[in-house]
A protein has these predicted regions:
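Glycine-centered flexibility motif
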Residues: 15, 19, 26, 67, ...
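General N-terminal targeting signals
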Residues: 31, 90-92, 231
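C-terminal accessory extensions appended to soluble enzyme cores
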Residues: 221-222, 227-264
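Alpha-helix initiation/capping motif
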Residues: 15, 48-51, 59, 169, ...
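N-terminal [4Fe-4S]-dependent radical SAM core
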Residues: 1-72
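Compositionally biased, intrinsically disordered low-complexity regions
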Residues: 21, 28, 42-44, 188, ...
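Conserved AdoMet/S-adenosylmethionine-binding subsite of the radical SAM
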Residues: 53-217, 222-224
């Protein structure tokens, strides 16, 4: 069985605002919308500042220490950090990120075209505690979003290839742009679109050729391997399949060991 990657231990999600709008095929079965629906929340497309979460990284315990310890912080996982409705709150969020230099903030977006206009004045070549990331689900999303992400200066550029709903040829853009890590996962939900193992291997081989770290985190609810379709796989089984395959490719430590995490 593969060793658990450095990023698969413990993390925290920070959702300073909640709510989003679907922008592409990868959003069809978004867990945020499905989760809100299961709780009877009917206005998931209304973006609201969180009353309880906004200042989470700055909250302190009775001893005056930060409640949120040095770790990886998955940012805006129930929205998009660069969504238009959050423009009036984002400067304050950047200030919080700036103050917590001991944490690493993973900022994942499907709106890379907005990143440049939403960066703080002192961004420079990037904050040392921020990893800018995009999610891509198919070839068109990859072709559109990777140049937009990598044209923005940052110390780390990552890609969450999830949910992977079709084959993606990555060589051409990896020849041109520096990507640090690709995390790949299938779609896990009722009526999930299948992920094919051949697609996974194709991305992995491209990562090896280009010196990019590759992590396969789940195979999806419906998974195809060798022409056989496996359906309705529970999330625990999906993770076991990935571990048994042992195909992660680690170029170097993606995260400090003190910031090991499970990425949603």
């Amino acid at each position: 069985m593969a060793d658990i990657p450095d990023f698969v231990k413990n993390s925290v999600s920070w959702n300073p605002w909640h709510g989003c709008h679907r922008v592409s095929e990868g959003c069809r079965n978004c867990y945020m919308f499905l989760g809100d629906e299961s709780r009877g929340v009917g206005d998931s497309d209304t973006v609201r500042r969180s009353k309880t979460q906004f200042d989470l990284p700055l909250k302190k315990d009775r001893k005056g220490s930060f409640q949120l310890k040095d770790r990886l912080v998955l940012t805006s996982m129930t929205s998009d950090f660069f969504i238009e409705e959050a423009d009036e709150w984002r400067d304050e969020a950047w200030s919080i990120i700036r103050r917590r230099k001991d944490c690493t903030f993973v900022i994942l977006t499907k709106r890379p075209h907005r990143i440049g206009a939403c960066l703080p004045p002192d961004w420079g070549d990037g904050y040392p505690n921020v990893r800018l990331s995009v999610s891509v689900e198919n070839q068109s999303a990859w072709d559109e979003r990777i140049p937009l992400l990598c044209d923005v200066p940052a110390l780390k550029h990552d890609v969450f290839m999830a949910p992977m709903i079709g084959p993606i040829s990555t060589d051409a853009l990896l020849d041109r742009y520096k990507v640090d890590c690709i995390y790949l996962g299938g779609e896990y939900c009722p009526n999930a679109r299948p992920c094919d193992y051949e697609w996974v291997l194709g991305v992995r081989e491209s990562c090896i050729r280009h010196g990019v770290t590759f992590h396969w985190r789940n195979c999806g609810t419906n998974f195809i391997k060798g022409g056989t379709v496996y359906t309705d796989l529970p999330i625990e089984t999906q993770g076991s399949i990935c571990c048994s395959a042992d195909i992660d490719h680690i170029v170097d430590d993606v995260m400090p060991k003190s910031r090991q995490t499970t990425l949603f």
